């Protein structure tokens, strides 16, 4: 009886020990699986959250462009130039920007010009000091200078006669020019900057007492010809439906340098004359017209 009882107890003890061993093994496997799963999840998380090895480009819209979008979307004012006219200048700026862009006139198109030349320098020359204050107060990032003109539209016929004089055919810094059409009162950096694009859309020129664009057109051409880096300057003249803009642009920017005319806008491409001494003021086909 005792032997049978002892045998039963031994069997029961063995069973309990085996059960504990099995449970312990299962526990170890479960713990190992849990640890591996946690490590895998953690690794995946770190892999996803890990910063890229190379910095990503910033895709945020620049303030100057967002200002332009908001301004033109909400504005009811018609720009000075039509879509087709603006497209001519835009094609040039698409190729040259960021570049040095000089604009005669500060107007409702100014924010657009600065935006099309994003990353470059766009400088506006304006005759109306009060208007400069109004515009730059709203758009302080626009760079502009107040300038003074001493000509009048009523004198344009007399000034046109200067095209025959040697003083007005000579290429030099406008400040040193002996031509009466040369504008000498601008800030120094206007003359010292190599302008890639020039837009003549000012000063006022729609009545006889207005300063007119005679000197602006001549000086734009002189700045282009006097480039010391040997580059070419694209010059645009707006309102060529008026006699002054029409006649002075052909006479002093030269029909031979004319590239395109769209609506009231005329486009010239003028090379530096300093790169080759003896270059005539206008090419041989000066009579070419669009």
UniProtKB/Swiss-Prot annotation:
It comes from the Eukaryota. It is a single-pass membrane protein. GO terms for biological process: methylation; xylan biosynthetic process; xylan metabolic process. Signal peptide: none annotated. InterPro entries: IRX15/GXM/AGM (IPR006514). Belongs to the methyltransferase superfamily. This is Glucuronoxylan 4-O-methyltransferase 2. It comes from Arabidopsis thaliana (Mouse-ear cress).
């Amino acid at each position: 009886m005792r032997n049978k009882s002892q045998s039963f107890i031994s069997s029961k003890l063995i069973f309990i020990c085996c059960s504990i061993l099995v449970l312990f093994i299962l526990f170890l496997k479960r713990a190992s699986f849990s640890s591996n799963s946690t490590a895998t999840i953690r690794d995946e998380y770190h892999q996803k959250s890990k910063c890229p090895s190379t910095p990503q480009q910033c895709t945020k819209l620049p303030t100057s462009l967002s200002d332009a979008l908001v301004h033109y979307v909400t504005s009811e004012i018609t720009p000075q130039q039509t879509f087709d006219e603006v497209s001519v200048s835009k094609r040039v700026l698409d190729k040259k920007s960021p570049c040095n862009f000089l604009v005669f006139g500060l107007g409702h198109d100014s924010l657009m010009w600065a935006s099309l030349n994003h990353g470059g320098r766009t400088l506006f020359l304006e005759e109306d000091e009060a208007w400069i204050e109004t515009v730059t107060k709203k758009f302080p990032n626009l760079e502009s200078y107040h300038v003074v003109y001493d000509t009048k539209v009523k004198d344009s016929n007399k000034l046109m006669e200067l095209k025959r004089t040697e003083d007005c055919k000579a290429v030099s810094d406008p400040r040193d020019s002996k031509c009466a059409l040369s504008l000498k009162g601008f800030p120094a950096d206007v003359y010292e900057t190599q302008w890639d694009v020039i837009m003549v859309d000012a000063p006022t020129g729609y009545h006889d007492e207005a300063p007119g664009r005679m000197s602006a057109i001549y000086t734009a051409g002189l700045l282009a010809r006097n480039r010391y880096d040997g580059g070419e300057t694209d010059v645009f003249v707006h309102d060529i439906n008026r006699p002054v803009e029409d006649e002075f642009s052909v006479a002093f920017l030269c029909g031979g340098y004319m590239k395109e005319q769209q609506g009231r806008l005329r486009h010239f491409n003028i090379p530096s004359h300093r790169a080759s001494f003896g270059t005539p003021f206008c090419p041989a086909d000066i009579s070419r017209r669009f």
